[in-house]
Amino acid sequence: MTDWQNHALDKLDQIATSSATVFKAAKPFPHLVVDNFLSTEIAGALLNEFPADFDPIWQISDQKEIQIKLRSNWQSETNIRPATQSVVHFLNSGAVMKCFSKLTGIEKLISDPYYTGGGLNCTKRNGLLDVHADGNWHDAMGVHRRLNVILYLNKIWDPSWGGALELWDEKLTKCVTSIDPLFNRLIIFETHDLTYHGHPTPLMCPPDQSRKSLILYYYTASPRPKNQILVERPHRALWRKRQMRELA
């Protein structure tokens, strides 16, 4: 391992040992925020190679009131730039996943070599992500999605722009916790049918700025606990606004 990897792994191991109780007790569902996760150099390298808006790597998600953003369409590891690839490999390593298991209590985590739904995300001015619970299943691997990890890459950020990650209660009545997407901030949280999250208010950053992140998902072969299941079958995201329309 390189120096930055050793440093980040030591930090994760210490956090997993000291903060498991904090993670599990967090409201509205288990989560943890880790600031200054990577070395300044490697976090800066990630930002420096972040694709431009017009890069062909981007897949456009433009669903009014649901999600308006850019998402990387990684077909293979050859599409991933060097610093990003090194961080992705590190976060998907056995040593890191053992730390995540120690922190969360979710054993035998599996990374996603297909990067389904994960990778780089970029939200421009007026972009949004409606409050939702994530899809629960990986079709290609036949495994259950259990954990989300987000690393933010916003060197310049003003909270007045909006764009904070909102964690909502399971009845979808209110935002309980709001987390600003600050540079080199890592967020780890459980994902299941009741872990509603998003940034539903259109982003008001200047036209030359954006909300940047790296997102990875982790899975288990064994099913999630029954009390985390609303929909038994494999499903994609459960969007708040779509559910409200169905109930209207």
Which sequence ranges carry the predicted segments?
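Eukaryotic charged/polar low-complexity linker/IDR segments
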Residues: 148-150
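Non-heme Fe(II) oxygenase catalytic core, chiefly the N-lobe of the double-stranded beta-helix
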Residues: 48-51, 79-82, 88-145
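Catalytic core of Fe(II)/2-oxoglutarate
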Residues: 137-145, 155-248
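Proline-centered turn/helix-capping motifs that create local helix->coil transitions or kinks
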Residues: 54-56, 107-110, 155-159
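Non-heme Fe(II)/2-oxoglutarate
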Residues: 4, 11, 20-103
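Histidine-centered active-site/metal-ligand motif
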Residues: 31, 132, 197-199
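Fe(II)/2-oxoglutarate
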Residues: 1-27, 232-248
